[in-house]
């Protein structure tokens, strides 16, 4: 009989934070453009090692309201926020990231920061 694999207890798991952002630009941007811009901003500002430690992960983007969610390691929230503020253009069009807020859960992030943009 096979044994069940052992799981990490919650105290040893890596903790994440979720950043809600709004993208303000000359034109509406697509999901793939935003995803690429976030990754490039992380790499150019934090470097390869810093990006590996921060573990930025694109969660969701609403093209209608131009708002989205990014997951990051809890120790590197401010570093990723800084990296996003340095973005000035995406594919040749002027754009800036506006951080709406940070939360420990997606549910709370949607309720507190993204509800006014129609997120449920």
From Swiss-Prot:
NCBIfam families: PRK03717.1 (NF002986)
Assembly with partners or alone: Consists of a catalytic RNA component and at least 4-5 protein subunits.
Listed GO CC annotations: cytoplasm; ribonuclease P complex
One function term, GO molecular function aspect: ribonuclease P activity
Annotated catalysed reactions: Endonucleolytic cleavage of RNA, removing 5'-extranucleotides from tRNA precursor
Cellular location(s): Cytoplasm
Listed EC numbers: 3.1.26.5
Matching HAMAP family: RNase_P_2 (MF_00755)
Database matches in InterPro entries: Pop5/Rpp14/Rnp2-like, Rnp2-like_sf, Rnp2_archaea
Protein name, as recorded: Ribonuclease P protein component 2
Protein task: Part of ribonuclease P, a protein complex that generates mature tRNA molecules by cleaving their 5'-ends.
GO biological process: tRNA 5'-leader removal
Entries under Gene3D superfamilies matching the protein: Ribonuclease P, Pop5 subunit
Family (UniProt): Belongs to the eukaryotic/archaeal RNase P protein component 2 family.
Domain of life: Archaea
Native organism taxonomy: Archaea, Methanobacteriati, Methanobacteriota, Thermococci, Thermococcales
Class in the EC hierarchy, top level: hydrolase
Pfam families given in the database record: RNase_P_Rpp14
């Amino acid at each position: 009989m096979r044994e069940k694999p052992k799981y990490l207890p919650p105290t040893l798991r890596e903790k994440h934070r979720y950043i809600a952002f709004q993208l303000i630009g000359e034109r509406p941007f697509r999901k793939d453009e935003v995803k690429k811009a976030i990754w490039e901003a992380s790499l150019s500002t934090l470097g390869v090692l810093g990006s590996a430690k921060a573990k930025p992960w694109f969660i969701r983007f609403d093209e209608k309201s131009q708002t989205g969610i990014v997951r990051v390691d809890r120790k590197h929230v401010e570093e990723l926020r800084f990296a996003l503020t340095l973005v000035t253009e995406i594919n040749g069009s002027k754009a800036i990231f506006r951080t709406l807020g940070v939360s420990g859960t997606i549910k709370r992030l949607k309720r507190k920061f993204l509800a006014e943009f129609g997120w449920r």
